[in-house]
Design a protein with these regions (language model features):
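Short, small-residue-biased leader/transition segments that mark boundaries at the very start
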Residues: 2-6
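Active-site capping/gating regions of soluble enzymes
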Residues: 7-156
Length: 156
């Protein structure tokens, strides 16, 4: 389907970009065990009506990373790239459930970590306690996803 075409395009561009980045890092003598990579996941663009399934995103992202990122890199911290909070968490969880990878897979989300908390806060001091609870919940869900232990049944 169309979503798969866009994901393939994302895969190809991501792979080419990552290979170029690591070639340049090697040329500059960068110590790879001392870096973290902050890439996108292989997803269809946010404008695409057909997003495809969670496992396809996880499989294509891991395949892209496996083909592009040296094993010496200790960790990969993903951008959410316009995904919803739950989608970003589900995709990270699916990748970590696939088994061992040469790098730790974690998150460096902005919107996908903060969006619900900011909406709850709405600039009102009286909302701070509930805002903290919402933010803590989202962080906890992503923490579980880092070890492949997230479940949508834990969502509030």
């Amino acid at each position: 389907g169309l979503g798969d075409v866009y994901k393939r395009q994302c895969f190809e561009v991501s792979e080419k970009t990552l290979k170029t980045v690591f070639k340049e890092l090697e040329n500059e003598g960068v110590y790879l065990p001392g870096i973290l990579l902050k890439p996108n996941m292989v997803i269809s663009g946010s404008e695409c009506k057909v997003q495809g399934d969670m496992m396809k995103v996880a499989e294509m992202t891991v395949k892209c990373l496996t083909e592009s990122v040296p094993a010496e890199v200790p960790g990969i911290v993903f951008l959410s790239g316009g995904q919803s909070e739950v989608e970003a968490t589900e995709h990270l969880n699916a990748m970590n459930k696939m088994g061992d990878h040469p790098w730790a897979l974690s998150f460096s989300y902005g919107r996908a970590l903060q969006q619900s908390a900011l909406k709850t806060w709405n600039g009102q001091k009286d909302n701070l306690e509930s805002t903290y609870a919402v933010f803590h919940h989202r962080a906890e869900m992503n923490s579980l996803a880092c070890s492949g232990e997230y479940s949508s049944s834990l969502e509030i």
